[in-house]
Curated annotation (Swiss-Prot):
InterPro entries: Ig-like_dom, Ig-like_dom_sf, Ig-like_fold, Ig_sub, Ig_V-set, IgHV
Gene Ontology CC annotations of this record: extracellular region; immunoglobulin complex
Keywords: Adaptive immunity, Immunity, Immunoglobulin, Signal
SUPFAM superfamilies: Immunoglobulin
GO molecular function, one term: antigen binding
Gene Ontology biological process: immunoglobulin mediated immune response
Protein name: Ig heavy chain V region IR2
Signal peptide: 1-19
Domain Ig-like, chain residue ranges per copy: 20-133
Length: 142
């Protein structure tokens, strides 16, 4: 009986580890004004295709600013953007790889900041913005 309980306990732990939601941004760095940079957010631990994905940034010394959102297949992959971006940013996603991309063009000094991806809506509003990546720093400077 003890052996069976141990087995159940180990399986439960492994299941918890394997199902842990993870988001990991990459692609940041030093970028010259007017250039382009593409950020990526690799995810795991959930059914990526079910969820909307969000990008949020934080400029030095400022609060969080919502950047953009891309919805899921059920919502035709529609993307929405913050007004300050003026068509310079483009969101895309690859459901087969569970990755969301943020293409940033004609980058400006005011785009400097830490960029975070976050899991958005997936059918339950209480799950919105619960999971975040660690962020990737974009520094715009000549």
């Amino acid at each position: 009986m003890d052996l069976r309980l141990t087995y159940v306990f180990i399986v439960a732990i492994l299941k918890g580890v394997l199902c842990e939601v993870k988001l990991e941004e990459s692609g940041g760095g030093l970028v010259q004004p007017g250039m382009s940079v593409k950020l990526s957010c690799a995810t795991s631990g959930f059914t990526f295709s079910d969820y909307w994905m969000e990008w949020v940034r934080q400029a030095p010394g400022k609060g969080l600013e919502w950047v953009a959102e891309i919805r899921n297949k059920a919502n035709n992959y529609v993307a929405y953007y913050g007004k300050s971006l003026k068509g310079r940013f483009t969101l895309s996603r690859d459901d087969s790889k569970s990755i969301v991309y943020l293409q940033m063009n004609n980058i400006r000094s005011e785009d400097t900041g830490i960029y975070y991806c976050s899991r958005g809506y997936g059918g339950y509003s209480e799950n919105w913005f619960v999971y975040w990546g660690q962020g990737t720093l974009v520094t715009v400077s000549s």
